[in-house]
Amino acid sequence: MPATPQLQLICTDFDGTLHSDFTEPAVPIALQVKLSEVKAAGTQWVINTGRTLEDLQYGLDKANLSVHPDYVVVVEREIYRYEGDEFIPHNEWNERCAAAQAALFAHISDRLPEVFEWVNLHFTASVYEDQWSPFCLIAGNNPDADEIQKYVEKKFADEPLLSFVRNDVYARLSHAEYTKGTALKEVARLLNIPCEGILTAGDHWNDISMLQPECAQWVVAPANAIPEVAQYVRSINGFIAPSDCGLGVLEGLEWALNDI
C-alpha cells in the first residue's frame, strides 16, 4: 500500500490569500499559530508572490508576523531562502531565469513600441518597463485589463514562450517557463519533497500555475478567489474555503490535515 501522505510544504500566495489589506491583523493570529505549529513539526512554508522582494519585505514587516517563511518566490519566479533575517538568493535558478527572460525580451523588443502606443491611445492606463519586464501594466479597471490582455496575447500569439501574467489590474510580460508553478517545483526539488506532500493556496490568475495537481496534493482557494480560480479549484476537487484570505488558508490547512 502507498505510504500515507504527510504535509511537508505549504505554498501560499501573499496578497488576497495569506494577507489582506482590509483586516487587522492582516494575517489572522490563528493562522500564524497554525503555521508555527506545522513548522515546528517539520513542515516548510514558501510565500509565492508577484511582489518584488523589497515590496514583500515591506509587507512582512508591516504585518509583524510571529512566524516566517522558509522560502519566498518573488515577481512570480525568483527564489530566495529565508535564513535569520536575510533572504539568500538561489543563484543558479535566478540567473538562469534572468538569462532566459533577457533573451526572450530582446527578441520581441522591436514589437513593443506599437503595443505601448495602442494601450496609451485607447485606455487610461499606466504602461512602463522595469527590471523584470519590458511591458508592465496597471489598467484603470478589470474590463480594460481584459481588453489589453486579449490584444497583447493576440499580438504575440506566435511567441509561445511569452506569457501575460496578470493579477487584477496589474500585469507583466514574462517567460512562460518561469512561473509560480515552476518556481514551486524547484523549491520542492531543493527540499526533496514530492507533490504528494504539498499544499498550495491562491486566489488570482497568476496563482493558477501553482494550483495544479502536478504541483500539489491539496489545492486551496479562499472564498475571495476570482471566479475563474474558484471554478478551476472546484474542477480538480480542491477546497474552496468558506472564509476570505488568511482565514480561508487556515480552513484549507485544517482540511488537508484532516485528510492525513
Name each model-derived stretch.
Residues 3-24, 211:
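Asp-based phosphoryl-transfer active-site loop
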Residues 5, 173-174, 181-260:
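Mg2+-dependent phosphoryl-transfer enzymes with acidic/Ser/Thr/Gly-rich catalytic loops
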Residues 9, 71, 197-199:
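Structural motif
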Residues 27-120, 124:
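Active-site phosphate-binding/coordination module
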Residues 39-40, 157, 234:
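Anion (oxyanion) recognition and catalysis
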Residues 83-92, 179-180, 255-260:
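Short, surface-exposed amphipathic charged segments that create phosphate/polyanion-binding patches used
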Residues 111-199, 205-214:
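Conserved acidic, metal-coordinating active-site core of Asp-based
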